[in-house]
Amino acid sequence: MGKRMSLILGAFLSVFLLVACSSTGTKTAKSDKLKVVATNSIIADMTKAIAGDKIDLHSIVPIGQDPHEYEPLPEDVEKTSNADVIFYNGINLEDGGQAWFTKLVKNAQKTKNKDYFAVSDGIDVIYLEGASEKGKEDPHAWLNLENGIIYSKNIAKQLIAKDPKNKETYEKNLKAYVAKLEKLDKEAKSKFDAIAENKKLIVTSEGCFKYFSKAYGVPSAYIWEINTEEEGTPDQISSLIEKLKVIKPSALFVESSVDRRPMETVSKDSGIPIYSEIFTDSIAKKGKPGDSYYAMMKWNLDKISEGLAK
């Protein structure tokens, strides 16, 4: 009986050690991958489209949350400290307002343009116009697909610099991704060119569509200018309603990452319906419409053009 028990125990230990070794091997293989951190779901999705499974990727701001103001979790601090490369938007997004990202990388002892990089580098910046934010950069450059292409090229450039052994994969994926975005951009311009000029007005909660407006020739109006200021005050709401009495657009839109109630008040008091939810600061959860940068931009372009054409 003792001998049999020894054999069973020996077999068990052999299996245990085999599993443990296998597990350790997997862990080591994973740790060999480039450790990449992106500040939000949009940048993370672009990075994933270019890098695929060649990297370990962590996105800081959860899907559906506001990247302007965020309190990093312990996991975010750990991942940032251990990252080989960090991608952030810049131009007054994560480094505006309470500057949560600036504090995060400082505490992690990371260096700009060595460890962390602004993916917006090289875009033509548009500036805010409101009294409290006048002269500050408008961060929402990705809402112009041409800027999304610049973001993607900046991401690929740093991935290649940090991980040259996978250069061929990054270049191949970038080429396919850029072609896809260029095709969508061309289709969007045709759609908006076909809409009558007197119907062209995007009305949103946050004034985040300036880059979109410039790219596709559609002016914008909003309740508040940027999410770092007061949002949906009575004065902001009444000011927009007065404008809408003159302009009379056919539809309103509300962003997925903001409180719907201010726009619902505008809709009720103006008699103008909310046509659709749209995406600005975040992609959608996996499996939902808008669950990638490409998908969210296609959704926005389709819904806005449909709403304005009514």
Curated annotation (Swiss-Prot):
Task: Give an example GO cellular component term for this record.
Answer: plasma membrane
Q: Which GO terms describe its molecular function?
A: metal ion binding
Family membership, please give it.
Belongs to the bacterial solute-binding protein 9 family. Lipoprotein receptor antigen (Lrai) subfamily.
What does this chain do?
Part of the ATP-binding cassette (ABC) transport system MtsABC involved in iron import. Binds iron with high affinity and specificity and delivers it to the membrane permease for translocation into the cytoplasm. Has low affinity for Zn(2+) and Cu(2+).
Q: Outcome of altering H68A?
A: 46-fold decrease in affinity for Fe(2+). 100-fold decrease in affinity for Fe(2+)
The family database entries (Gene3D superfamilies) matched by this protein are listed as: Nitrogenase molybdenum iron protein domain (3.40.50.1980)
Compartments, as annotated in UniProt: Cell membrane
Question: Does the entry feature the keyword Ribonucleoprotein, yes or no?
Answer: no
- A UniProt-annotated Pfam family: ZnuA
| Record-given protein name | Iron ABC transporter substrate-binding lipoprotein MtsA
Give a yes or no for keyword Ion transport in this entry.
yes
